[in-house]
């Protein structure tokens, strides 16, 4: 047993309290994710105006729409897919976004679905650009290149918040014994950090490679969608399936099943891009 294995014993998921409200590391990490994604996108607009012919004010307006779509979609998606009492929320819709418990204590909004956030993001992007659909693929590409690094902070936030634990490490796994985290007296994979690396860093490198080698609007979001789906499918083998759902056919988790659907959506965007997008003009 090493110091890393027992890090949760010495770490408090609450960063500080402000006016009686407990601020969690996850909230701070999520704020960092938004800031990183925003400024990464601005940097891309400045460095490659031919690929991203968007004014800053225009992007700022779009970013608000996209972020709102992500938050709404992520929360509603969680309630519909993962929440055991989803029927209650369907009849008490306002409770989905209620940050207070029945006693009036602030507990924040807990439970977000990445795939739900993706749906919300796509809907928001379409609604924002419906008057000029030629820019839709440009917006999607811009988010595809700025989202992965922000995603890293989100998964680190999950780790600091001590949630979304990994599967139990087999006793014969030497690497697992080194990197595992003790949770309720069981050594588990740090799946949140594995996801941060695979779905964040690796996917970012994939999209950057695509940016260098492709000249058609819409291909970056396709590479992101396919790359994320693959990395999420792999990472799910180290992540404990949601207790209320378990696994399905072929022992696949809900995250893996949704990743398959994400591949289908990505291929649909690819078909749309090849028919409706023009190549980026060279200097």
Curated annotation (Swiss-Prot):
Primary location class: membrane
| InterPro entries attached to this UniProt entry | Lgt (IPR001640)
Top-tier EC class: transferase
Q: Where in the cell is it found?
A: Cell inner membrane
- GO terms for molecular function, please? phosphatidylglycerol-prolipoprotein diacylglyceryl transferase activity
The entry's cellular-component GO terms read: plasma membrane
Q: Does the keyword Magnesium apply?
A: no
Which pathway is it part of? Protein modification; lipoprotein biosynthesis (diacylglyceryl transfer)
Q: Which residues cross the membrane?
A: 18-38, 62-82, 106-126, 136-156, 190-210, 218-238, 252-272
- Give the membrane topology, semicolon-separated if more than one: Multi-pass membrane protein
* Keyword hit for Nucleotidyltransferase: no
What is any one GO biological process for this UniProt entry?
lipoprotein biosynthetic process
* Pfam families noted in UniProt: LGT
Q: What is its EC number?
A: 2.5.1.145
Provide the alphabetized UniProt keywords. Cell inner membrane, Cell membrane, Membrane, Transferase, Transmembrane, Transmembrane helix
Residues binding a 1,2-diacyl-sn-glycero-3-phospho-(1'-sn-glycerol): 155
Query: What is the stated purpose of this protein?
Result: Catalyzes the transfer of the diacylglyceryl group from phosphatidylglycerol to the sulfhydryl group of the N-terminal cysteine of a prolipoprotein, the first step in the formation of mature lipoproteins.
Which family is it part of? Belongs to the Lgt family.
PANTHER family documented for this protein:
PHOSPHATIDYLGLYCEROL--PROLIPOPROTEIN DIACYLGLYCERYL TRANSFERASE, PROLIPOPROTEIN DIACYLGLYCERYL TRANSFERASE
Know the name of this protein?
Phosphatidylglycerol--prolipoprotein diacylglyceryl transferase
């Amino acid at each position: 047993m090493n110091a890393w294995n027992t890090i949760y014993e010495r770490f408090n998921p609450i960063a500080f309290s402000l006016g009686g409200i407990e601020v969690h590391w996850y909230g701070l990490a999520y704020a960092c994710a938004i800031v990183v994604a925003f400024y990464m996108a601005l940097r891309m607009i400045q460095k490659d105006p031919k690929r991203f012919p968007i004014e800053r004010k225009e992007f700022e307006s779009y970013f608000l729409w996209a972020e709102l779509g992500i938050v709404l979609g992520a929360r509603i998606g969680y309630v519909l897919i993962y929440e055991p009492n989803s029927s209650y929320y369907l009849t008490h819709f306002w409770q989905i976004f209620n940050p207070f418990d029945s006693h009036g204590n602030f507990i924040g909004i807990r439970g977000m679905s990445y795939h739900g956030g993706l749906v919300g993001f796509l809907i928001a992007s379409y609604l924002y650009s419906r008057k000029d659909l030629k820019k839709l693929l440009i917006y999607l590409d811009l988010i595809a290149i700025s989202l992965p690094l922000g995603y890293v902070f989100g998964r680190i936030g999950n780790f600091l918040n001590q949630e979304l634990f990994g599967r139990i490490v087999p006793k014969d796994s030497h690497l697992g014994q080194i990197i595992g985290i003790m949770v309720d007296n069981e050594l588990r994979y740090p799946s949140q950090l594995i996801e941060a690396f695979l779905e964040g860093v690796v996917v970012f490198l994939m999209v950057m490679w695509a940016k260098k080698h492709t000249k058609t609007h819409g291909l970056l979001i396709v590479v992101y969608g396919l790359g994320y789906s693959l990395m999420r499918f792999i990472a799910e083998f180290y992540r404990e399936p949601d207790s209320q759902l378990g696994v399905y056919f072929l022992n696949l988790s809900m995250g893996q099943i949704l990743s398959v659907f994400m591949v289908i959506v990505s291929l649909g965007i690819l078909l749309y891009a090849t028919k409706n997008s023009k190549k980026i003009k060279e200097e």
